[in-house]
Amino acid sequence: MAYGTEYENDAMIEIKCPFKEATLLMKVRKSNSNLDILIRTKNIKKFSNK
């Protein structure tokens, strides 16, 4: 999924990793002519399987 941000050149990509039960959020921001990549992991709640 791609989420729009208040900055036109910004993009946020959310990748779900079930085996790690975590969500990887990669935020790529274009500043000047360089790309700064901020990567952080966020814990997500378990979903009960039926």
Swiss-Prot record:
This is Putative uncharacterized protein DDB_G0280305. It comes from the Eukaryota.
